[in-house]
Structure formats: structure tokens, C-alpha cells
């Protein structure tokens, strides 16, 4: 399963669980548009005051240097950040 397929399932699960979900576009892979800084997690989910940044990875996928840096920065600011490689991992978190 690709990261994109996992991400679609994650968005659906989060929405069904009552989260407001934002897909954050930080890369230029498809349309040469960058809306967020490099390394920004793929999803931002909000529910009743809980803010969760989610980086999706295919099983065995590794974080880039910019992703590690951004995740560290977010956590230093008190944010909850998760790196998940499947729906079951995400389901356990929410």
C-alpha cells in the first residue's frame, strides 16, 4: 500500500472519528506548489482542543532530515506529533 493510499484511509478514519482534518501540502512533487515549510507533517487533525500532527509513512519508510527537524520543532512547542505507517497505528492513537 502506498503512502497516498494510507493517507486517504487515515483522513476517512479521522473524519469518521469527529476530527477536523487538514491535508498539508509541503512538497513540490505534483504541482510545484509549496504551502508549508519543508518537513511539515502530512495531516493536521483537530478535535475538541486536541491538535495532532500526523506524518504518514509506508511500512519501512524513513523520515527525511527536514521531517525529523520539523517534528522536533513541533514537539519542542508542545505539539502532539505522530508518525504512522498504517491505519491500525492511527486508530490506537485516537
Predicted regions span which residues?
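Catalytic phosphate/metal-binding cores of nucleic-acid and nucleotide-processing enzymes, i.e., regions
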Residues: 1-94
Amino acid at each position: 500500500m502506498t503512502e497516498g493510499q494510507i493517507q486517504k484511509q487515515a483522513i476517512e478514519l479521522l473524519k469518521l472519528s469527529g476530527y477536523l482534518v487538514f491535508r498539508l501540502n509541503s512538497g513540490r512533487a505534483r504541482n510545484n506548489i509549496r504551502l508549508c515549510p519543508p518537513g511539515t507533517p502530512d495531516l493536521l487533525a483537530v478535535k475538541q482542543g486536541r491538535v495532532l500532527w500526523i506524518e504518514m509513512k509506508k511500512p519501512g519508510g524513513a523520515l527525511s532530515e527536514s521531517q525529523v527537524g520539523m517534528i522536533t520543532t513541533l514537539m519542542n512547542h508542545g505539539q502532539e506529533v505522530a508518525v504512522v505507517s498504517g491505519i491500525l497505528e492511527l486508530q490506537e492513537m485516537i
